[in-house]
Amino acid sequence: MGITVIGSLNYDLDTFTDRLPNAGETFRANHFETHAGGKGLNQAAAIGKLKNPSSRYSVRMIGNVGNDTFGKQLKDTLSDCGVDITHVGTYEGINTGTATILIEEKAGGQNRILIVEGANSKTIYDPKQLCEIFPEGKEEEEYVVFQHEIPDPLSIIKWIHANRPNFQIVYNPSPFKAMPKKDWELVDLLVVNEIEGLQIVESVFDNELVEEIREKIKDDFLGEYRKICELLYEKLMNRKKRGIVVMTLGSRGVLFCSHESPEVQFLPAIQNVSVVDTTGAGDTFLGGLVTQLYQGETLSTAIKFSTLASSLTIQRKGAAESMPLYKDVQKDA
């Protein structure tokens, strides 16, 4: 079938400023923009745009919007990116989700985000609905991508694991929420940044180990995050299937390991990039990674492609609309 993203759709309200105001202070910002967003939408858009045009698999978005102007614009954005929106529901009496994003231009485009979930709160599916979304009798491998901007992704992950064993579960636990150790083992491809990686370790391993890692990170950042990546792979991942851990380290680069190459590898970030807005960088990276792996590329090749794609995204404003096309990445490769 292809790649399905189950997640959030938000309308982004972006304010660009030199700095954030202090408590009780009114500060004049530089300018204001609106964009399509939500981690689910961003990842689906990235997958749609970074998919090789010669590939014939489908890209689907599963989620909900309100019956308002914001919702219509979000659905149009997905369609323009080549994403099937058949299962994007429209709810009456509830607004489309929104994200208020504050972007500090004098701090390298770093952002802070406030979410109002709106119609994303309705993205909950019972077994009957899941059977309709994922019909029986499909033998093709499918990737299903999750984040944590919807109420209960874990219940859907458990259903897929039990009922569609040929599916690969891709999980980006953002914003982070702790889960029992056994539930992390349901994931086939885990994609985290350094903060989320450390949060997982803190939630499932003993405090003494966590304190030791925290103490050493300041002196050996890369070495300690290698240890975290190893822990996530060796102690949590479902190695019966693909078994991949990818950890992004912002401007430093990416750590990754897999069942094919359990030793943690490091790819430095692309340097000398003019950073405008980092909002869509992580979602672009995930989109590129998933498309490349689904198309049969090696993990190393997929990481290189994704790193280049995200480096192009951060040179433009916005999230979904700032993401490059497959041909743009190939041109810069």
From Swiss-Prot:
Entry EC no(s): 2.7.1.15
Active site location: 283
HAMAP family the UniProt entry points to: Ribokinase (MF_01987)
GO cellular component: cytoplasm; nucleus
Keywords, comma-separated and alphabetical: ATP-binding, Carbohydrate metabolism, Cytoplasm, Kinase, Magnesium, Metal-binding, Nucleotide-binding, Nucleus, Potassium, Transferase
Cofactor binding note: Requires a divalent cation, most likely magnesium in vivo, as an electrophilic catalyst to aid phosphoryl group transfer. It is the chelate of the metal and the nucleotide that is the actual substrate.
Free-text activity regulation comment from the record: Activated by a monovalent cation that binds near, but not in, the active site. The most likely occupant of the site in vivo is potassium. Ion binding induces a conformational change that may alter substrate affinity.
Binding, substrate: 10-12, 38-42, 149, 283
One Gene Ontology molecular-function label: ATP binding
Miscellaneous comment in the UniProt entry for this protein: Present with 1780 molecules/cell in log phase SD medium.
Residues annotated to bind K(+): 277, 279, 313, 316, 318, 322
Purpose: Catalyzes the phosphorylation of ribose at O-5 in a reaction requiring ATP and magnesium. The resulting D-ribose-5-phosphate can then be used either for sythesis of nucleotides, histidine, and tryptophan, or as a component of the pentose phosphate pathway.
Protein's cellular compartments: Cytoplasm; Nucleus
Main subcellular localisation: cytoplasm
Name of the molecule in the record: Ribokinase
